[in-house]
């Protein structure tokens, strides 16, 4: 009997759906979940964010950095 092939479950975008959080540059707690410990934006293939929402997220993170709500780099 052959072993059943392993299928990795497709991750769903955390920003799609009815009660999904809104991406806002003022919501630093939400944005920090998508920044690495070195201060870099985590890629969507790791966070499972859709391409459209990843662009929105990157824009919000960059805006928050510019307004000094988030650090550019962590020492």
UniProtKB/Swiss-Prot annotation:
Coiled coil: none
Entry keywords, A to Z: Ribonucleoprotein, Ribosomal protein, RNA-binding, rRNA-binding
Gene3D superfamilies cross-referenced by the UniProt entry: Ribosomal protein S18
Single GO biological process annotation from the record: translation
GO molecular function, one term: structural constituent of ribosome
GO cellular component: cytosolic small ribosomal subunit
Database matches in InterPro entries: Ribosomal_bS18, Ribosomal_bS18_CS, Ribosomal_bS18_sf
PROSITE patterns per UniProt: RIBOSOMAL_S18
Subunit structure: Part of the 30S ribosomal subunit. Forms a tight heterodimer with protein bS6.
Job of this protein: Binds as a heterodimer with protein bS6 to the central domain of the 16S rRNA, where it helps stabilize the platform of the 30S subunit.
Family affiliation: Belongs to the bacterial ribosomal protein bS18 family.
Protein name listed in UniProt: Small ribosomal subunit protein bS18
Gene symbol of the encoding locus: rpsR
